[in-house]
Amino acid sequence: MKRLLSVMSFAAALVLVVACAPQETGTAEAAAVPYGANKEAGATFVHDGVTLYYETYGRGEPLLLVHGNGGSIGTLAAQIDHFKAKYQIIAMDSRDQGQSADSHEPITYEKMTDDLAALIEHLKVGPVDVVGWSDGGVEALLLGVRHPGKVKKIVSMAPNLNPGPEAFDPEVSALFKSMTELSDKARNTPEGRRQHKVVGMMLKEPNIPPAMLANVTVPTLVLASDHDLVRLEHVVAIYRGLPNAQLAIFPNRTHLIPFDDPAQFNATIDRFLATPFKEIDLVPETMGSYEKLMTGLAR
């Protein structure tokens, strides 16, 4: 029951985050900048017959930020505000979400991923670092699979390879189903139809074979919280399936850590992006550190 109440609380929080992010997430400066509705930073382009809205901020190496299911650029306010001082930030409303157009066809993670690749091509940047949260974490991994030449480093927060019981506990799957049923009742409006399509996707997708992770050869940081929606066992399996990966689990946090504790979330990403990737050779490096410790104590 406690776990179910926690999941229900998450649902309420997620609705508030998606609805209010431009005003209520990030720093005071982020609240003052209308991320997701900034005419000075926004533009559109067309890919696969769909008009897609994006915004860019800052200068430096390109960093692509990818929002979660039903979200928009506005939900990335705390991340845009933090990283724009160091990077050229690129953020896009996924098809059927935010200010991007309705695709008038079923939505898939592969289509959204190909939209991101097209945006990179459109802006003539790349390869880029990419940070994705939730659905965006799935798209970040798929960029590494489908468009490996367009990415340098990947940060994937709480991704899943499929919507099955290995990824989600039964009460979480029930939550997704109830959210779909609620959106189904609103399908008489254009926005309601969009929401039903996007939320309903979570019940059927993604469908990424675990063996496909071996194709993601760029350095990848896999993130999750210890009270996440995605089962930790599933997240760890994703980490282990990636050939050049690091893993970080946020203690006493939830799926909403980018909004609840953006300082910790952003700092973890900062370190990964700024530090050259190094694969740890477990036994030799552990023993080397141990010898240094013992030498220091002997002095």
Give the ranges of each region predicted by the language model.
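C-terminal motif of bacterial Sec signal peptides marking the signal peptidase cleavage site
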Residues: V18-A19
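Conserved HGGG/HGGXW glycine-rich cap/lid loop of the alpha/beta-hydrolase fold
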Residues: V50-Q99
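Active-site loop/oxyanion-hole signature of alpha/beta-hydrolase fold enzymes
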Residues: A91-V131
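Conserved hydrolase catalytic core segment
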Residues: G126-G164
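Active-site nucleophile elbow and catalytic-triad environment of alpha/beta-hydrolase enzymes
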Residues: H196-M212, D226-V230
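Short beta-strand/loop motif that positions the catalytic acidic residue
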Residues: V216, V222-A224
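Conserved loop-alpha-helix segment in the C-terminal half of the alpha/beta-hydrolase fold
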Residues: A224-R253, G296-R299
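Catalytic active-site module of serine/aspartate enzymes centered on a nucleophile-bearing elbow/loop
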Residues: P251-R299
